[in-house]
Amino acid sequence: MSKAHIIGFGKSGVAAARLLKKNGWEVELSDRNTSDSLQQKEKQLTQEGITVKLNYSFEPETSLDLVIVSPGVPWDLPALQRSRETGIETIGEMELAWRYLKSSSWVGITGTNGKTTTTALTAAIFQTAGLYAPACGNIGYAACELALQDTLPDWVIAEISSYQIESSNTLSPQIAVWTTFTADHLSRHYNLENYFNIKADLLNRSQIQILNGDDYYLHENAAHLYHNSYWTSIQGKANLVADVTRGIYLEDGWVVALQEKIIPVELLQMLGSHNQQNLLMAVAVAKFAGIENEAIAEAVKNFPGVPHRLEYICRWNGVDFINDSKATNYDAAAMGLKALVAPILLIAGGEAKEGNDNDWLRQIKEKVVFVLLIGSAAEFLAKRLQKINFLNYEIVENMERAVIRGAALSKKYDAKTVLLSPACASFDQYQNFEERGEVFRQLSLGLNHKKKNDIRFGSSRI
């Protein structure tokens, strides 16, 4: 019996373990952590015949035939390097799913920003057209969960991160989309060139490539990579990288794809030019899949957006509270500010990331009346604000204080919106950006239950 070891006890790791067990493998699953919840999962998986090792650091063994890596595990981990050097096949969970789901067609969507919204909208269009096309990867299902289902998908709509691409050596989607490219995850990938090449590799292996021509870096650096690629632009056909016959663009208020009018852009409910860019890419995918315009229009009209991305939470005393927790870098946070009407009270901070913050700082100067800083990056971001002589900021440390203080200051500064758009990772205070956004949501919704004086003066008695 072949033996596999899965690293990581999250949703992806558990799904990979169950998939291999179902297909006759001897399976062990490990995680460096231990907790009550993991121990409960351990009991269940042990009953299924899967060996679980908690509080365990992986080391390759000669008895292993396969090592599966969950998305959050660094690909250059010394133990994984030794595994590869000794000839043990070492792949990611997404690659494993691909091998079991080759009978389904795949859409692979990658990019620094925009991939979650594009993935969710694409899946919504396909499902409106009557196809079983679940979203998976970074959102929705773990990819291996789809391979475990009795009914296999017509299409797999996969949001694929750079981490997942580098651990997937044969993953070759029929259609691949590259949404944006900016400096991110450099602590993982070391330099911009390496990060770019990892993203590009997914498109190299795909049959149809769709790229966002409104992204400056892609426009300047990716045009020569793919000879028959398709390009989008919200700025019209004059801005297309490709010939107009391979373009998807806006013209006279319409989405035009491959020289055919598809839908009026006004059907899109989401705010911001970046969401129009996402729309064009999703429509392009739909047309290559043969979906009718009526289904595209119906799906776009009813698509509300994705949680934690410019998500409207509530209105308190005439001020809107907006959750943009998924803005984990400067470029995404700048896009969020561009999409909203000034004056804005901004909550930012978390775990700092490398990147160019010039556009983000420019948007703050133009649109923001006050900034509340949270997390380990608070002092660093305060210094960046001082550099542009923006002194309307306060370090409040945590989200609870930020929401209370934001509610109080919103009246003083006549802000239309209190916006959580961190421009930082979440791992200093939260498990992920979703948890951070949920905390913001609950605190914002709870404002109506606070004492008026506590909110009026931004009380920290909480």
UniProtKB/Swiss-Prot annotation:
GO terms for molecular function: ATP binding; UDP-N-acetylmuramoylalanine-D-glutamate ligase activity. Keywords: ATP-binding, Cell cycle, Cell division, Cell shape, Cell wall biogenesis/degradation, Cytoplasm, Ligase, Nucleotide-binding, Peptidoglycan synthesis. Its EC number is 6.3.2.9. It catalyses: UDP-N-acetyl-alpha-D-muramoyl-L-alanine + D-glutamate + ATP = UDP-N-acetyl-alpha-D-muramoyl-L-alanyl-D-glutamate + ADP + phosphate + H(+). InterPro entries: Mur-like_cat_sf, Mur_ligase_C, Mur_ligase_C_dom_sf, Mur_ligase_cen, MurD. Cell wall formation. Catalyzes the addition of glutamate to the nucleotide precursor UDP-N-acetylmuramoyl-L-alanine (UMA). ATP binds at G111, T112, N113, G114, K115, T116, T117. It is found in: Cytoplasm. GO terms for biological process: cell division; cell wall organization; peptidoglycan biosynthetic process; regulation of cell shape. Pathway: Cell wall biogenesis; peptidoglycan biosynthesis. GO terms for cellular component: cytoplasm. It comes from the Bacteria. Belongs to the MurCDEF family. This is UDP-N-acetylmuramoylalanine--D-glutamate ligase. Its main location: cytoplasm. It is an enzyme of class 6 (ligase). Coiled coil: none annotated.
